[in-house]
């Protein structure tokens, strides 16, 4: 799938808000309000991604928005918990040393000594740094099923090779 066709989930709808078709928005973007910078929104309706335009949005105990053409509460309620997506090509381009999390999923993780630790299965934030969840190889000699590796540039993360889909880390395989 080309970047032009790739669909990225950036949030989801919460409950309806008011009687005029407004919906609460749960943003998955780093800066929650930036979800409104990405246009058009794609919403999966009956198995198909359909384009929608945001007519208006505001802050109210979180974020709420009004979609163009959605004017009554009852119709808005049918959108509760639906995902909000955008095409990947509307996201900002990053510099060579920056990555979207989605780019790291599935990458092979190896130590600087060549020991294969597994593949990136998930990533989560902590107060100080992001953490890679690496699903270990089935035949791992250390009996690990997964490893949590801090995403600390230069100290732990030595190299990220987009072409080879590989991350090199300075990490003890025993952990």
UniProtKB/Swiss-Prot annotation:
Cleaved signal peptide residues: none
Major localisation: cytoplasm
Entries under HAMAP family matching the protein: Ribosome_mat_RimM
Alphabetical list of PANTHER family matching this protein: RIBOSOME MATURATION FACTOR RIMM
Entry-linked Pfam families: PRC, RimM
GO cellular component: cytoplasm; ribosome
Family: Belongs to the RimM family.
GO biological process terms on file: ribosomal small subunit biogenesis; rRNA processing
Domain comment in the entry: The PRC barrel domain binds ribosomal protein uS19.
Organism: Aliivibrio fischeri (strain MJ11)
Matching InterPro entries: PRC-brl_dom, PRC_barrel-like_sf, RimM, RimM_N, RimM_N_sf, Transl_B-barrel_sf
This protein's name: Ribosome maturation factor RimM
Annotated Gene3D superfamilies: PRC-barrel domain (2.30.30.240), RimM (2.40.30.60)
One MF term in the entry's GO annotations: ribosome binding
């Amino acid at each position: 799938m080309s970047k032009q066709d790739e669909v990225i989930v950036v949030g989801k709808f919460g409950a309806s808000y008011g009687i005029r078709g407004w919906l609460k928005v749960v943003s998955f973007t780093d800066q929650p309000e930036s979800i409104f910078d990405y246009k058009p929104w794609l919403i999966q309706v009956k198995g198909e991604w359909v384009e929608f335009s945001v007519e208006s949005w505001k802050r109210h105990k979180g974020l709420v928005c009004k979609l163009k053409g959605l004017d009554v509460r009852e119709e808005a309620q049918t959108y509760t918990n639906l995902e909000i997506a955008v095409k990947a090509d509307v996201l900002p381009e990053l510099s060579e040393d920056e990555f979207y999390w989605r780019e790291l999923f599935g990458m092979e993780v190896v130590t600087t000594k060549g020991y294969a630790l597994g593949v990136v299965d998930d990533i989560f934030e902590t107060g100080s740094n992001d953490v890679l969840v690496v699903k270990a190889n089935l035949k791992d000699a250390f009996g690990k099923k997964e490893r949590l590796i801090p995403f600390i540039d230069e100290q732990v993360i030595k190299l990220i090779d987009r072409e080879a889909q590989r991350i090199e880390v300075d990490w003890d395989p025993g952990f």
